[in-house]
């Protein structure tokens, strides 16, 4: 009923829009095409979060400003950890959205992880945020298949001066936010900027320190993690930027900085983790006329001292699995814009590189040493390098029709494959401030670094396992069973005909059953005629059993019973057809996007090692073979044959106790060690789904604004024929995101005095498949509020309350319960 109410309200607002006359104005965006253009002319669906919103909504993590954007899911995993999902499946750890700050990628290249708390993002220094929905591959290249989030900072020419902001807040755990120990959020931020009178030189400095407590986990989770998680996280960043503008046609910007964080992260593979790393970066950007070039480099390092390094809370009970990854990244890009007649043209080149060192002990030999950490194991030192070249043309076919064509070729050196990502948009300008867009695009992507290079032993999902990424194929060219039978090592040592393969020889079964058969047969009628211990352990009897031994084939059960090899990484594609409408109609803004997306050749993690169990049908063969052997050893007479058959039947009965349940596992040829379950990746053929994003905004007055938006997916769970598999296949693919999302709210932002805003976010229930955090996710409605008071243009007080009503929820099952949090901030500008 609530969903119907939200949708009815939304449609009512939307219906009023159609009667409003357009006016000559237009919101400008940069990120859709890497050059300035009106939002209604952009070839992609875009949203802009402006300076007024940023200024009036205090946050200690600017990612929170994205939570009301249509088509974007912002998952708050903990007190200060957020993950961004645009038009794609959601992950706990990774994202398929690229995050930029002034053109520099701040989501990890290749690994595709974004942690705003460990960047130099600052609310004091943000001018606006642009969100581009849908494929960005034709412009931004690899791993931008779902969209781009671009944070754009203030320059010292438009925004000189010194600003400070002090924030303090709390989390509602067991008690209220004001309860003992819950008021544990603090942040101090500084921005100083200046420029000369001629506007040719300027600089700015940003500094920030923050700390926060954490939301508590439930008792069941705490039993697996050894108690509650980190008591307090902290982080800081300092950066300086120089601006040189000797003329209107030349601008050079150089930036350097450092950021660090000690805090929590979550992963579907490894669950809760403590992270401790430091990131140093440098960026140089130049614009000369129509030519733009940028180079950036960064280095993220973990502490040298093992006692200070990150670790995973519940991968093992006896040995801490360390969480470290030293990453070096660099990016170089160049773009040139020109106009030929009625066609605007942009061409560009770029290069992205990242290398990884997870500090695996290459000398490890014992299971304990192998399971001590180093996520990339034998793949440590691997790199991901992508070269790309692209173009985009915008041709005015008539006064009201534009054709935008783009394409990009990327070479993925880590898999030695290349791919072309095309895009075409036909724009119909229904008025100066409205347009209809028809778009067809194909994004190219491949596995991220974690999917490719993972290579280690661990205890993910509570079971001993070994994960191997798809950089290397796991095969079963020489398959054999690793047995879980007690005493199997002694049996193998005593057996001259021990069989290593997909079965077990009769003599091994004989030796394995001896400890229970000797007392059992001694107490039977056989014991009246035969010295059972001496007989069954007689070398002559053993030699006879060996001579008559045969192989009992096992039955493979569970996953991958056909012993198919895992798949290696390759190019995947996402093809999207989209119809979009965007308009700024007087006081109204409206955007409607309807799309169909087809994913091809995508990867998912699966168990690839089957279990082995003995077939019950072999009991008769065992009884006959051993009965004959024992009878002959007892002389071959009638009594000997009867006693021999009784003993043979006894061994068959003992064998039956071993059937019906797995007694071993078949590991891949590339296994670290035998026994733990193998996980590997499989490439699926194709899935298809539809989606829609609808957004409205109404400026009731210059200071009062209302918004409502709705996002819809036709399907979020795929199986069998949906993914190109047979009806008997157990494989599934999950987008891990709800089908329905509704967001609405209002804001009041005057130039002085009181200000505030109220918003709600609704999503329907769904079932997630996220490793540790799999399970049912209930529907939820979350209300947020913020209010403040501007004492003057220099002094402002603000309060931001998340989850105002205090109804706790989890992003996914097993994650922390997110209750109310509040932050009060005092901002002063000199």
Regions inferred by a protein language model and the residue ranges of each:
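Gram-negative outer-membrane beta-barrel transporters
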Residues: 165, 396-400, 584-589, 594-599, ...
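Outer-membrane beta-barrel domain signature, strongest for Gram-negative TonB-dependent receptors
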Residues: 224-345, 349-354
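Short acidic/polar hinge/loop motifs at secondary-structure boundaries
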Residues: 104-133
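Periplasmic-side early beta-strands and strand-to-turn transitions of outer-membrane beta-barrels
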Residues: 158-160, 165-275
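Extracytoplasmic beta-strand/coil segments of soluble accessory domains associated
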Residues: 38, 63-105
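N-terminal periplasmic "start-of-domain" segments of outer-membrane beta-barrel proteins
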Residues: 26-57, 80-83
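Membrane-embedded beta-barrel scaffold of Gram-negative outer-membrane proteins
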Residues: 294-296, 302-304, 471-677
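Conserved C-terminal beta-signal and adjacent last beta-strands/turns
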Residues: 6-8, 193-201, 208, 698, ...
């Amino acid at each position: 009923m609530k969903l119907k109410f939200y949708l009815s309200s939304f449609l009512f607002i939307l219906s009023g829009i159609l009667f409003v006359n357009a006016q000559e104005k237009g919101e400008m965006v940069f990120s859709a095409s890497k050059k300035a253009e009106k939002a209604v002319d952009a070839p992609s669906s875009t949203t802009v979060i402006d300076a007024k919103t940023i200024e009036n909504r205090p946050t200690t993590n600017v990612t929170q400003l994205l939570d009301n954007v249509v088509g974007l899911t912002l998952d708050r995993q903990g007190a200060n950890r957020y993950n961004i999902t645009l038009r794609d499946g959601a992950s706990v750890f990774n994202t398929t959205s690229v995050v930029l700050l002034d053109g520099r990628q701040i989501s990890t290249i290749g690994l595709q992880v974004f942690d705003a708390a460990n960047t130099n993002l600052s609310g004091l220094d943000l001018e606006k945020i642009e969100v581009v929905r849908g494929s960005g591959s034709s412009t931004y290249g690899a791993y931008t298949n779902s969209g781009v989030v671009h944070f754009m900072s203030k320059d010292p020419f438009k925004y000189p001066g010194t600003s400070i902001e002090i924030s303090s807040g709390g989390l509602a755990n067991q008690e209220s936010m004001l309860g003992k120990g819950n008021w544990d959020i603090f942040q101090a931020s500084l921005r100083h900027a200046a420029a000369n009178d001629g506007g040719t030189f300027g600089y700015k400095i940003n500094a920030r320190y923050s700390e926060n407590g954490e939301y508590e986990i439930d008792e069941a989770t705490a039993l697996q993690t050894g108690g509650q998680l980190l008591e307090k996280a902290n982080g800081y960043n300092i950066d300086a930027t120089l601006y040189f503008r000797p003329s209107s046609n030349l601008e050079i910007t150089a930036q350097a900085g450092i950021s660090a964080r000690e805090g929590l992260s979550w992963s579907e593979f490894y669950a809760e983790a403590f992270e401790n790393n430091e990131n140093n970066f440098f960026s140089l950007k130049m614009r000369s006329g129509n030519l733009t070039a940028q180079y950036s480099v960064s280095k993220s390092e973990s502490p040298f001292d093992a006692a200070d390094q990150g670790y995973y809370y519940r991968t093992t009970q006896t040995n801490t699995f360390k969480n470290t990854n030293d990453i070096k990244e660099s990016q170089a890009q160049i773009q040139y814009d020109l106009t030929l007649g009625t066609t605007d043209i942009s061409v560009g080149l770029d290069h992205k590189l990242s290398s990884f060192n997870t500090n695996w002990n290459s000398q490890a030999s014992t299971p304990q040493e192998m399971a001590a950490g180093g996520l990339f194991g034998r793949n440590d030192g691997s790199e991901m390098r992508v070269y790309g070249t692209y173009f985009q043309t915008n041709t005015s076919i008539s006064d009201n029709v534009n054709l935008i064509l783009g394409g990009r070729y990327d070479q993925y050196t880590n898999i030695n494959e290349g791919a072309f990502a095309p895009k075409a948009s036909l724009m119909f300008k229904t008025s100066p401030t409205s347009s209809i867009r028809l778009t067809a695009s194909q994004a190219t992507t491949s596995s991220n670094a974690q999917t490719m290079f993972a290579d280690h032993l661990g205890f993910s999902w509570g079971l001993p396992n070994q994960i191997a990424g798809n950089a290397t194929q796991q095969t079963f060219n020489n398959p054999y069973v690793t047995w879980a039978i007690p005493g199997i090592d002694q049996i193998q040592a005593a057996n001259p005909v021990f069989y290593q393969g997909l079965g077990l020889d009769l003599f091994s079964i004989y030796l394995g059953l001896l400890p229970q058969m000797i007392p059992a047969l001694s107490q039977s009628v056989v014991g009246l005629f035969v010295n059972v211990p001496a007989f069954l352990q007689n070398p002559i009897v053993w030699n006879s059993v060996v001579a008559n031994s045969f192989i009992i084939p096992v039955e493979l059960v569970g996953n991958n019973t056909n012993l198919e090899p895992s798949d290696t990484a390759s190019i995947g594609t996402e093809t999207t057809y989209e119809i979009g409408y965007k308009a700024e109609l007087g006081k109204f803004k409206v955007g409607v996007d309807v799309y169909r997306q087809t994913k091809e050749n995508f990867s998912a993690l699966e168990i690839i090692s089957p279990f082995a169990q003995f077939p019950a049908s072999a009991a008769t063969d065992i009884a006959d073979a051993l009965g004959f052997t024992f009878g002959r050893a007892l002389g071959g007479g009638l009594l000997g044959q009867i006693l021999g058959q009784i003993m043979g039947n006894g061994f068959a009965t003992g064998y039956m106790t071993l059937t019906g349940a797995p007694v071993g596992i078949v590991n891949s040829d590339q296994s670290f060690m035998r026994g733990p379950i193998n996980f590997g990746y499989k490439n699926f053929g194709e899935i298809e789904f539809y989606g829609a994003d609808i957004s409205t905004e109404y400026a009731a007055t210059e200071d009062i604004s209302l918004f409502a938006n709705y996002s819809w997916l036709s399907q979020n769970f795929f199986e069998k024929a949906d993914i190109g598999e047979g009806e008997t296949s157990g494989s599934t693919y999950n987008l891990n995101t709800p089908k329905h999302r509704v967001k609405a709210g209002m804001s009041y932002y005057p130039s002085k005095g009181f200000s505030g805003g109220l918003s709600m976010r609704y999503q329907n229930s769904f079932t997630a498949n996220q490793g540790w955090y799999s399970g049912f996710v209930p529907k939820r409605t979350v209300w947020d509020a913020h209010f403040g008071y501007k004492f003057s243009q220099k002094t402002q007080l603000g309060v931001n309350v998340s989850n105002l009503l205090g109804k706790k929820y989890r992003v996914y099952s097993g994650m922390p319960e997110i209750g109310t949090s509040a932050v009060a901030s005092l901002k002063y500008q000199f």
